[in-house]
Amino acid sequence: MAYPAKRKKEIRKREVKGNIEAAKELAFRFLSYRSRSSEEVRQKLSQAGCAPPDIDGVIARLEELGYLNDYDYAFAMGRSWIEIKCWGPSRIRDALVKKGVAPETITAVLRELAMEHDFRRVACRALKSRFTRAEMLKLNGDKMRQRAIGHLLRRGFSWSIIADVIDSGDNIFG
């Protein structure tokens, strides 16, 4: 749902204040770019000067219409972070917390993502994208091994997955 540039400029901070319709329009415009968490929408409306009761009403209406669903948002973001960025569960959890997703929702999403994806394979893909085959064959050396471990830790993988992947280093490119 795209809004013409002229209409975008019409919604100013003073217009949004006390005007629930303008707040709804601002929220729709904010959601037109990409999916957002309810906390992101709440912050955006708050920055625009909306009153807290108006913000709650707009968010409730967006959820009712199906435009705002934290579970679907978290699942879609988690899936894309796994498939595109090769992130592990810890990194996904941290990113979703920063986006304002509820802890129960994050736990449920991570449980479902773990059933859908093998994080061991994701960790192998993360190493393949970071290191060349020749570098990976040198995993016996402490320096290269520490680099690989550090890379996977930064990507959010657990020690058990990292140990499993590093110990089977010869199979990573196979």
Residue ranges of model-derived segments:
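An alpha-helical, amphipathic repeat domain used for nucleic-acid recognition
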Residues: M1-G174
